[in-house]
UniProtKB/Swiss-Prot annotation:
Main location: cytoplasm
A Pfam family assignment: Cytidylate_kin
Reaction(s) catalysed by this chain's protein: CMP + ATP = CDP + ADP; dCMP + ATP = dCDP + ADP
Cellular localization per UniProt: Cytoplasm
GO biological process terms, semicolon-separated: pyrimidine nucleotide metabolic process
A GO term for molecular function: CMP kinase activity
Name of the featured protein: Cytidylate kinase
Alphabetic keyword roster: ATP-binding, Cytoplasm, Kinase, Nucleotide-binding, Transferase
Stated family: Belongs to the cytidylate kinase family. Type 1 subfamily.
Cross-referenced InterPro entries: Cytidylate_kin (IPR003136), Cytidylate_kinase_dom (IPR011994), P-loop_NTPase (IPR027417)
Gene Ontology cellular-component annotations: cytoplasm
Enzyme class: transferase
Chain segments annotated as coiled-coil in the UniProt record: none
Amino acid sequence: MTHVFTIAIDGPAGAGKGTLARRLADHYRLNLLDTGLTYRAVAYALIQHALPLDNVSAAETAARQVDMAKLDRAVLSAHAIGEAASKVAVYPTVRRILVEKQRAFARTPPGAVLDGRDIGTVVCPDADIKLYVTASAEVRAMRRLAEIESIGGTANFTEILADIVRRDERDMGRADSPLKPAADAHLLDTSEMAIEAAFLAAMAIVDDVLTRRNKA
């Protein structure tokens, strides 16, 4: 790849888009950005400074200070931070600040794989490849439960499922940049698909685009 190449991956929480994004970025040697971590970083900053999540001005300041190169997944992956992130993500001004940072990241050679909720529709509407990765709420809840138990934690399936449904409703129902597939996105339903199968399906889509582009 000699030009900046962008792969946009969108979808609800727990559908497997993060794992898929990492696999694709590694395979095609592209930069990787989990845009959800940028919103989590804003929420984390507010929590660390004991500021209320509805303090829009403080959230805007935190958004401007987010460093894309220093997003600590281990710290930012906490469940409570994810819940808080969904709340600060509804502020249009915060979204605009972070979207500009995300776009700048995508423009950095050799290109990037970005995963989130509005990559193909808002952040990178001209992305070379757009994937919308989804799965049923029940499957996503089971995956989340297994993930928590794999690291020695405990959780309740019913509570996790209810949380996922609430988050879906919030993400899909917000007025600014709602979660939805781009009109030209390739749909990948991973409800009955292992990550390897999803990766191979996505790779086939990317390779097809690259092949046609090289022939043009």
